[in-house]
């Protein structure tokens, strides 16, 4: 059988000489709304992130419809570790490290496909779709003395490392840590806000249009935080050209006034966050146009969605953004969803795809696909705006003084409580930074607390 996490125990906890637990905790001051800029640029912190954050979090790898048939597979990443996600004979899904246990070569080098087995191109070790080592060239000659008896080599001991796998309403998540809480516990009270996009119909969702991939030279936390907490940029300067381009011909910017009425959500545990406007469809209209806006907010499909997600007044919610910590981000109503794969402290690789209601009319699915190409893909007008800001921030962070500054995360900190009882969980004003403070506080805890005994919900 394939190796489990317990077969490859990590070394005892060691800390960088620069980053003790107390030093890490001092980087994020949620009570006073201050962030140390080194969290975005320090190489030692990044190496610890790979172990403490990406080695212990539930990471979104794709959608069940990416691998519908037995033997269908998708190669992706958990942090910087390459993995293979495979549909099994019993229709379950396995995820295992894309690393041959002989000399560490990548087992599968294609993006995806269908297979009955995987063979390493270096020495020909072969694994079945469950990750079991099933064939070793010259096994008897290489590992035995050609006498009867124990060869001292058991193929069952040499399968690739297996991750835990759980799904949430079509999304596939994996986790390396056997001690981490189950997925639903990890998602905490964020699930109703995810359901706004994932549970609108009994047919569920499906991924369309393939997976688009591109690299942005910025730290992964800038992207994750923006989708977690930052409606502020959309309401100020960042997206004016994109908004204008998306308006119907008979409208101009003078007819669009972004709302000041809205909320954001900070999860009780886990660093997840979301934000949205209330009773104002102008942002959705300007991004995806009238056809999708009408489908998402009016008519039978919208009414069914409201019945299926009774915890939230979803017909009043517009322009929602959300991040499931650390790197799963999406925009309900626009329906882009992506994982931010870290590539060092100064680079992130974006893997994005489009989700639609599985029973939506074909013309609606196609409209979602086309609007996402226009707005939120590698060349999309809004994606370009966001990326330009993140890239320039990271360039600034090269400087010694720039990395030594304290950044302001005080929005909403001293404002009277804006908690909205219509929305479950802890909520704040839409132009606050409550969700961002929650995200960075959880990041700080994961980085400084090596045991789930203190970290768990």
UniProtKB/Swiss-Prot annotation:
Superkingdom as given in the UniProt entry: Bacteria
Keyword NAD on entry: yes
EC numbers for this chain: 1.14.12.18
Residues binding [2Fe-2S] cluster: 100, 102, 120, 123
Pfam families (UniProt xref): Rieske, Ring_hydroxyl_A
A GO MF term: iron ion binding
Pathway in which this enzyme or protein is active: Xenobiotic degradation; biphenyl degradation; 2-hydroxy-2,4-pentadienoate and benzoate from biphenyl: step 1/4
Catalytic activity: biphenyl + NADH + O2 + H(+) = (2R,3S)-3-phenylcyclohexa-3,5-diene-1,2-diol + NAD(+)
Entry keyword set: 2Fe-2S, Aromatic hydrocarbons catabolism, Dioxygenase, Iron, Iron-sulfur, Metal-binding, NAD, Oxidoreductase
Entry's cofactor comment: Binds 1 [2Fe-2S] cluster per subunit.
Claim: Lipid metabolism is one of the keywords in the record: no
GO biological process: catabolic process
Broad EC category: oxidoreductase
Domain Rieske: 58-174
Cofactor: [2Fe-2S] cluster; Fe cation
Positions annotated to bind Fe cation: 233, 239
Coiled-coil intervals: none
Complexes and interactors: Heterohexamer consisting of three BphA subunits and three BphE subunits. A ferredoxin (BphF) and a ferredoxin reductase (BphG) must be present to obtain activity.
UniProt family annotation: Belongs to the bacterial ring-hydroxylating dioxygenase alpha subunit family.
Protein name as annotated: Biphenyl dioxygenase subunit alpha
Naturally occurring in which organism (per UniProt): Comamonas testosteroni
